[in-house]
Amino acid sequence: MPADQRPLAIALMGPTASGKTALALEAAERWNGEIVSVDSALVYRGLEIGAAKPDAAMRAAVPHHLLDLRDPWQVYSAAEFAGDARQAIAQIVARGKLPILAGGTGLYFRALLEGLSHLPEADRAARASIAAEAEQIGWAGLHSELARVDPVAAARIHATDPQRIQRALEVYRISGRPISYWQALPPGLRLPVRVLKVVLAPRERAVLHGRIERRLDAMLAQGFLAEVEQVRALPQMRAVAVPLDLPAVRAVGYRQAWEYLDGAGSLAEFRDKAIQATRQLAKRQLTWLRGELDARWFDPERDRHQLERALVGFLGDRSAVRQASGV
């Protein structure tokens, strides 16, 4: 199908706390859209406050997809996401509505928009072994090991990104080939829609840091720690030998809350650790987004008129986009 005849979709990308949720809701109301979540934390039931999951009122106003797909003791892969998202997008297009992809999980976006390389499946035993090594030598030490066996991947993966270090070493150990080899293979089927990629990101780092801090404080006031206590109390979670290895618990904020509730440090120390971890996540997200050469960048507060023109130019005119909040 020629590119100019494919159905339209927009991808609202950006670091955490940059305003994607608010803009997605506005765009859905204005252009008769439905929102497809591209967030690896929002797929888990019970992760509400700490994941900034759209509330009941938002979900009643605009249809949302790919929320609450798994329980927190389960695993959900990028390949599963790509298949589920492709199906949701096809259904949205069939209804004559606009698919709005909104989130900040780079692996999910790449899997959907570019296709996945043929990576080996996850291996629980290999992951457990790598996690045990991290307890002994630290993730920086494992990053050094990765640099020896796969310098290409090590150059892309930061030493403070344990999840990607673990996955890269896991792939190497179970397949005998570096993850960069698998990632260089031709990707799978690409998405048959024409997508405008929009990146929301404050130009000043201090602005984003302030939004992150204010959002965490709001989450704490809303009962974030009580939410984590509820997840911890689930019988299936109590049966997990190492819950910190679960993707749901590794989500930023949840991991630090889990460790705090295990007795690690004071409440103030937990808050500082959660803010720092969220800043590191935002930094990694911005690094990934800079590689999206066909994306249009906008400051969520300063570039409202430019953003308006970009969306209208791609989708057609409707009433003006309102000022986005910091969700």
From Swiss-Prot:
Reaction it catalyzes: adenosine(37) in tRNA + dimethylallyl diphosphate = N(6)-dimethylallyladenosine(37) in tRNA + diphosphate
Gene Ontology BP term (one): tRNA modification
Ligand binding (ATP): G14, P15, T16, A17, S18, G19, K20, T21
Keywords from the named record: ATP-binding, Magnesium, Nucleotide-binding, Transferase, tRNA processing
Protein residues bound to substrate: T16, A17, S18, G19, K20, T21
E.C. numbers: 2.5.1.75
Transmembrane found in the keyword field: no
EC supergroup of this enzyme: transferase
Cofactor(s) in the UniProt record: Mg(2+)
Source domain of life: Bacteria
Residue ranges of the region described as Interaction with substrate tRNA: 39-42, 163-167
Record-marked site positions (Interaction with substrate tRNA): T105, R127
GO terms assigned for molecular function: ATP binding; tRNA dimethylallyltransferase activity
Family membership noted in the UniProt record: Belongs to the IPP transferase family.
NCBIfam families listed in its UniProt record: miaA
Record's subunit section: Monomer.
Functional note: Catalyzes the transfer of a dimethylallyl group onto the adenine at position 37 in tRNAs that read codons beginning with uridine, leading to the formation of N6-(dimethylallyl)adenosine (i(6)A).
Protein name: tRNA dimethylallyltransferase
Naturally occurring in which organism (per UniProt): Xanthomonas oryzae pv. oryzae (strain PXO99A)
